[in-house]
């Protein structure tokens, strides 16, 4: 058919139809049907066409692909057809009889009188064999239908009487009548109730359970509604509790010698498992259906358990269950302990929704739209990965504690919910940082790395990472990292460098550091102008709040002089600068490199004379950058 619009008189004047064929893709060659209304609207399915025309137009007989009305052809059955079906099984018997009659006449004509007895005997034998085969087939069919069956409830053998219901085939007449009466009684209890139990005497709904809260007024007015959970008859037997008809359900007392009865009961808790002799046989049959076919066949062939006489076993007094649980199977309730709450909750085989229906979170109807669970929902633009209810709608009684909002959330609904994201995996550190941490064998916060003398190599600049400081020729470096107990080794150090760990005293106050980065580097032609001096803060008379470091025994001690009055005044000013926040100093937790040079070949004579000045300069200068002029003024 051409892909042009054609008239469709079946729908009325003005309607057009078009069939377009697919020319590419996996469905090449298939066609799509389109219809165009008199107003120009394009319709491509029968559902859209029904919605467009409305309920007044019946399209049950309309063929959407052909565009025609298909009237059903009435099926006419001739009268001769049933008669032919009836005569079909009788035709082979007649033909056999005719063939046997012809054989008899031929034998009588062709054979003499003394020889025709044997063929007739063989013919009669063949007839008897065929008749016996047909009779044996019918007998086997009748025998299979009337084979003795063992009753699944009482265990007696009975003959099958042609019951069509599959669940009643394995029950005898008495057990079948009890089963039918029990089902009829249970239906009455579900509709009306017994009228005697405590639940049937309640006349008003609680208004708290999920049935009362989810019910619409129109359902209540029409009468098609579920009963309140507190008004449901107590004589209703749930499927998980048993059928109430078999021997296991009718047993009222525990045996006292099975593995369940011999368990020591916990104080304050009811037993969760039922005695093996009181378990329903129907439940065992249902569980075997879920297993393999071999297990079901074995279960059907296994004989029923013999009843245990009560006279052989004396029931011990400490295992008597009458004071722990009711004896009636209808009132026997299992309990389970929740992981978060130490309260007893009724045990059911069905999936439980964790809500009580009475707390403020359960009564809340609207999502907050700001917690992490709401942000994950598709209606708020999320990816639907967590699939959890709003944190502010999680039940306060049954929900898990990790799903509830944090305690410090305050009055704001969306505040305080980010601490739950601490369970996520940490971000991976770059490979360079991991190599630096693994390559450092030291555990002390300070480490001294001495570079061998020699000219500065250009490869060091290439090996130095971003943000690192290149070592100066013939200098010693002191690496200090606040907030950690591991030393960091900067790139570019020699393999034969000496490492001396220094043990730091445990101090809770923040440690002040001396930072002299970006010192002007001299040319490599004059290495004798640089003289390396490594200084350790060993004085116990330093300012309060600074940790003292142990000195290296290999280095020569530094002469210390008592501070003068000017230094005392400056120390008092430095005490005020200690109160400045860490952000002004340059941040906490950044590695600091201390380099001390004796410019002009002179050695440093006193550490306490210039240390307070450097502290003051470090507190004032936020960028931790010192010019060469400031360095010379402070050192000299």
UniProtKB/Swiss-Prot annotation:
Residues engaged in binding Zn(2+) 1: 194, 197, 200, 233
Changes after translation: Sumoylated, sumoylation may increase interaction with ATF7IP.
Residues reported to bind Zn(2+) 2: 206, 209, 212, 228
Localisation per UniProt entry: Nucleus; Nucleus matrix; Nucleus speckle; Chromosome
Kinase among keywords: no
Zinc finger (CXXC-type): 187-234, 235-281, 348-396
Motif Nuclear localization signal, chain ranges: 84-88
Region (Transcriptional repression domain (TRD)): 550-612
Cross-link (Glycyl lysine isopeptide (Lys-Gly) (interchain with G-Cter in SUMO2)) at residue(s): 117, 293, 443, 461, 520, 559
Source species, domain of life: Eukaryota
Domain remark in the UniProt entry: The methyl-CpG-binding domain (MBD) functions both in binding to methylated DNA and in protein interactions. The third CXXC-type zinc finger mediates binding to DNA containing unmethylated CpG dinucleotides.
PANTHER family referenced in this protein's UniProt entry, alphabetically: METHYL-CPG BINDING PROTEIN, MBD, METHYL-CPG-BINDING DOMAIN PROTEIN 1
Description of how the protein assembles with itself and partners: Interacts with OASL, ATF7IP, ATF7IP2 and BAHD1. Binds CHAF1A and the SUV39H1-CBX5 complex via the MBD domain. Binds MGP via the TRD domain. May be part of the MeCP1 complex. During DNA replication, it recruits SETDB1 to form a S phase-specific complex that facilitates methylation of H3 'Lys-9' during replication-coupled chromatin assembly and is at least composed of the CAF-1 subunit CHAF1A, MBD1 and SETDB1.
Protein name: Methyl-CpG-binding domain protein 1
Species whose genome carries this gene: Mus musculus
Gene: Mbd1
């Amino acid at each position: 058919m051409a892909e042009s619009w054609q008239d469709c008189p079946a729908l009325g004047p003005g309607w057009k139809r078009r069939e377009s064929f697919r020319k590419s893709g996996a469905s090449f060659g298939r066609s799509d049907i389109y219809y165009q209304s008199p107003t120009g609207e394009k319709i491509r399915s029968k559902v859209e066409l029904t919605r467009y025309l409305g309920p007044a137009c019946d399209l049950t007989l309309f063929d959407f692909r052909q565009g025609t009305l298909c009237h059903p052809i009435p099926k006419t059955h001739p009268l001769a057809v049933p008669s032919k079906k009836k005569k079909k099984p009788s035709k082979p018997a007649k033909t056999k009889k005719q063939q046997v009659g012809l054989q008899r006449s031929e034998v009588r004509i062709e054979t003499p009188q003394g020889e025709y007895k044997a063929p007739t005997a063989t013919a009669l034998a063949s007839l008897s064999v065929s008749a016996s085969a047909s009779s044996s087939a019918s007998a086997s069919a009748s025998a299979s239908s009337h084979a003795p069956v063992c009753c699944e409830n009482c265990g007696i053998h009975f003959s099958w009487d042609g019951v069509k219901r599959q669940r009643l085939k394995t029950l005898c007449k008495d057990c079948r009548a009890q089963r039918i009466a029990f089902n009829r009684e249970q239906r009455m209890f579900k509709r009306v109730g017994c009228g005697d139990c405590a639940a049937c005497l309640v006349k008003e709904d609680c208004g708290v359970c999920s049935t009362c809260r989810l019910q619409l007024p129109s359902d209540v007015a029409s009468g098609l509604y579920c009963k309140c959970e507190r008004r449901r008859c107590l004589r209703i037997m749930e499927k998980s509790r048993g059928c109430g008809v078999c021997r296991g359900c009718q047993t009222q007392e525990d045996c006292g010698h099975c593995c369940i009865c011999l368990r020591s009961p916990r104080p304050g808790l009811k037993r969760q498992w039922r005695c093996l002799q009181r378990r329903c046989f129907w439940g065992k049959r249902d569980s075997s259906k879920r297993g393999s076919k071999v297990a079901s066949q074995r279960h059907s062939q296994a004989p029923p358990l013999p009843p245990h006489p009560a006279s052989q076993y004396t029931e011990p007094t400490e295992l008597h269950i009458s004071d722990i649980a009711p004896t009636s199977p209808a009132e026997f309730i299992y309990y389970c302990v929740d992981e978060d709450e130490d309260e007893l909750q009724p045990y059911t085989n069905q999936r439980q929704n964790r809500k009580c229906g009475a707390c403020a979170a359960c009564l809340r109807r609207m999502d907050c739209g700001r917690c992490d669970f709401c942000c994950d929902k598709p209606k708020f633009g999320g990816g639907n990965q967590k699939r959890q209810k709003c944190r502010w709608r999680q039940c306060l009684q049954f929900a898990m504690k990790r799903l509830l909002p944090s305690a410090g959330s305050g009055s704001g609904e969306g505040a305080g919910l980010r601490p739950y994201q601490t369970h996520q995996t940490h971000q991976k550190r770059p490979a360079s940082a991991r190599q630096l941490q693994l390559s450092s064998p030291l555990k002390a916060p300070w480490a001294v790395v001495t570079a061998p003398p020699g000219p500065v190599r250009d490869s060091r600049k290439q090996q130095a990472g971003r943000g690192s400081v290149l070592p100066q020729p013939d200098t010693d470096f002191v690496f200090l990292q606040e907030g950690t107990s591991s030393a960091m080794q900067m790139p570019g150090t020699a393999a034969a460098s000496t490492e001396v760990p220094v043990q730091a005293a445990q101090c809770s106050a923040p440690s002040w550091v001396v930072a002299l980065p970006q010192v002007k580097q001299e040319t490599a032609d004059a290495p004798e102008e640089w003289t390396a001096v490594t200084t350790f803060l060993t004085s116990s008379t330093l300012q309060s709040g600074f940790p003292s470091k142990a000195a290296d025994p290999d280095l020569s001690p530094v002469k210390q002089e008592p501070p003068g009055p000017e230094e005392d005044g400056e120390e008092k000013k430095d005490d005020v600068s200690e109160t400045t926040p860490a952000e002004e100093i340059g941040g906490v937790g950044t590695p600091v490199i201390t380099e001390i040079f004796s410019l002009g070949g002179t050695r440093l004579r006193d550490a306490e004379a210039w240390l307070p000045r450097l502290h003051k300069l470090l507190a004032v200068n936020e960028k931790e950058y010192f010019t060469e002029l400031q360095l010379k003024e402070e050192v000299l």
